Amino acid sequence: MSFDKKLLEIVACPVCKGKLDYEKSSQRLICKADHLAYPINDGIPVLLENKAERWQEAEA
C-alpha cells in the first residue's frame, strides 16, 4: 500500500505541531524543525515520538 500524499495537508509533527514532508525513498515523514523522521508502515504514518528516528538533511 502506498502513502496518500493528501494526508500531508492534515497531519502534523506530534512534537512541534509543524509541517511534515514526505521522503519517498525511505517511506518516512520528516519534520525538518525537530530533525525527526516518522516511519510509514503499509501506507499508514506512525506519528509517535518514541517511534521517530533522528534525521539529518543530506548535503546537496
UniProtKB/Swiss-Prot annotation:
Any single GO CC term annotated in Swiss-Prot or TrEMBL for this entry: cytosol
InterPro entries: Trm112-like (IPR005651)
Recorded family membership: Belongs to the UPF0434 family.
UniProt cross-references to HAMAP family, sorted A to Z: UPF0434
PANTHER family: PROTEIN PREY, MITOCHONDRIAL, ZGC:162634
Protein name: UPF0434 protein Ssed_2824
Source organism of the structure: Shewanella sediminis (strain HAW-EB3)
